A protein has these predicted regions:
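Pepsin/retropepsin-fold aspartyl endopeptidases
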Residues: 1-127
Length: 127
């Protein structure tokens, strides 16, 4: 099975810090945005709670949830919470919450995502 990969622009909206580009896997079966601990530390996102998460293999673990993650992808932008994953083998995981909020569609034939052309969401202007 092929994987859809994207580049995310992420910054801490609470500190108005720098924007970093982070590669991510798009996972329509995942619910939340997941970031590696290294990115969370680099950008200084605050932990707002701990939450039990369930993985695809049915394992459960307690993970920190951070806030203030401003994320831009496909010229769409929003602020999200993210699960902190201490030992990730990939940079980030883009789940359904971000996809739905930003009204993005997965194109499985081309292995990409794009904004819903019928969306009523405004497009972000990129300078």
């Amino acid at each position: 099975v092929e994987v859809v990969n994207v580049e995310l622009k992420i910054r801490n909206i609470l500190t108005q810090g720098p924007t970093v580009e982070v590669p991510a896997k798009v996972d329509t079966g995942a619910t939340l945005l997941v970031l590696p601990q290294s990115v969370v530390r680099e950008l200084g996102f605050p932990t707002i709670r701990k939450q039990t998460v369930k993985y695809a293999n049915e394992e459960r673990a307690d993970r920190e949830i951070v806030y203030g993650v401003e994320l831009e992808v496909c010229d769409r932008r929003g602020v999200f919470e993210a699960v902190v994953e201490p030992e990730k083998t990939y940079a980030a995981l883009l789940g359904a919450v971000v996809m739905e909020t930003l009204d993005l569609i997965v194109e499985p034939r081309d292995f990409r995502i794009y904004p819903n052309p019928r969306s009523k969401l405004p497009m972000a202007e990129i300078e």
